[in-house]
């Protein structure tokens, strides 16, 4: 028996809910509840309101999804590139 197919959709995080849950509006306007995948939690990837994310939805329940990718913001600069030389790591 093959593993069921998952739908991959993009959306924007509207609200960060308690217990590591998120409310996401998909590109087609549907609002779903979502949680961060285990790999994102393991690597301490933060998801904030307004972030663009990729979700996986099961074909059996289209109201819940798993966030498996947070897209990089084009406006943001690199991670800590503007540090003062006084705080350089050794």
Curated annotation (Swiss-Prot):
Listed InterPro entries: NA-bd_OB-fold, RNA-binding_domain_S1_IF1, TIF_IF1
Compartments reported by the entry: Cytoplasm
Gene3D superfamilies tied to this protein: Nucleic acid-binding proteins (2.40.50.140)
Keywords: Cytoplasm, Initiation factor, Protein biosynthesis, RNA-binding, rRNA-binding
Record domain S1-like: where: 1-72
Pfam family, one: eIF-1a
CDD domains: S1_IF1 (cd04451)
Gene Ontology, cellular component aspect: cytosol
Main location: cytoplasm
Gene Ontology MF annotations: ribosome binding; rRNA binding; translation initiation factor activity
PROSITE patterns associated with the record: S1_IF1_TYPE
Biological role stated in the UniProt entry: One of the essential components for the initiation of protein synthesis. Stabilizes the binding of IF-2 and IF-3 on the 30S subunit to which N-formylmethionyl-tRNA(fMet) subsequently binds. Helps modulate mRNA selection, yielding the 30S pre-initiation complex (PIC). Upon addition of the 50S ribosomal subunit IF-1, IF-2 and IF-3 are released leaving the mature 70S translation initiation complex.
Subunit composition and interactions: Component of the 30S ribosomal translation pre-initiation complex which assembles on the 30S ribosome in the order IF-2 and IF-3, IF-1 and N-formylmethionyl-tRNA(fMet); mRNA recruitment can occur at any time during PIC assembly.
Family (UniProt): Belongs to the IF-1 family.
Official protein name in the record: Translation initiation factor IF-1 2
Organism whose genome encodes this protein: Paraburkholderia xenovorans (strain LB400)
Gene from which this protein is expressed: infA2
């Amino acid at each position: 028996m093959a593993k069921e197919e998952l739908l991959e959709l993009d959306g924007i995080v509207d609200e960060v809910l308690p217990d590591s849950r998120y409310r996401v509006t998909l590109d087609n306007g549907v609002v779903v509840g979502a949680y961060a995948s285990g790999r994102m939690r393991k690597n301490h990837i933060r998801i904030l309101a307004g972030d663009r994310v990729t979700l996986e939805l099961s074909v059996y329940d289209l109201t819940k999804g798993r966030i498996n990718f947070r897209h990089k913001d084009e406006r943001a600069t690199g991670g800590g590139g503007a540090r003062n030389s006084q705080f350089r790591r050794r």
